[in-house]
Amino acid sequence: INNFIVATEPLGEAAKDLLSEPVAVADTRFVVNYWRLSEDNRLLFGGGESYGYRFPDIIKTVSKPMLQVYPQLAKTRITHAWGGTLAITVNRMPCFTRPGQNVLSASGYSGHGVAMATLAGKLMAEASAGQMERFDLMASLPQHRFPGGVALRWPLLITAMTWFSMRDRLGL
């Protein structure tokens, strides 16, 4: 799954009208929107997804939900836009495994890679030092293969993501 983010021009004192505290925010949608202010008072706003190999017009894709949250930014210039591909698991929980003797693996951070990869590294370091308990606890979380095998994986993924995105748009 591809996800995108934009940064506005510095907002100066107007930034306090958006967020009065230095917090990161995420909504409850399935196709989640998330935002925070940067050190120089730019709004960093992420959202939107795509499921293929080509990225859409990122500014257009992310501006729509950003302006739904903050319509007062309609005339604000977006100075940066970028995106990336995320590994998403079926249950959106990371996948910790031991694929072989003396081999540890962690992946599928579902958009939370900065925090989860840091945790995974710590748990892998502990496990490498013989303290397996916390790594094994994460490895015990149930993981499910995406249904449909090779032939149906992409069609089912696109159908499911379109369905959940439509539910978000309809407010269901």
Stretch-by-stretch model annotation:
Residues 1-13, 17-101:
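Active-site substrate-recognition segment that forms the wall
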Residues 100-105, 110-172:
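C-terminal lid/capping helical subdomain adjacent to the catalytic/cofactor pocket in oxidative enzymes
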